[in-house]
Amino acid sequence: VNDYEMMLNSITWTSFLLYYFAPEFFFPNIFIYRFFDLHKIADMFEIDLPSIPKKSNYKARCMYYWSLCEVFYRFRAENELSPAELCAFLYDFAPNFMPQKEADVPQPTQHGVSVD
């Protein structure tokens, strides 16, 4: 197993540990499961994110977290946020601030009744 592939598989837990021990520099990264949400937040609040590495480049994908830490460190410093306030911004305020699209339920193509 490639070391970077293994690290990538544990990046969420590693990010929580890094945040626990050094919250000034790291943030808990749960966006690995909600990557599109991170980009919507960045677009909404004009945060320049680093370019996304190729899926096959495990080293670059691992290092992407470090780049995100640098970006959010600067964002936190510029906006005078504490580490806890950055987490509140990323995981509570920003997702709830973004307009939600209401999904239209498509009309059924067939009508039927099921009788037991």
Question: Can you say where each PLM-predicted feature lies in the sequence?
Answer:
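Hydrophobic/aromatic-rich effector regions of fungal transcription factors
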Residues: 18-22
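C-terminal accessory module of base-excision DNA glycosylases/AP lyases that mediates lesion recognition
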Residues: 28-116
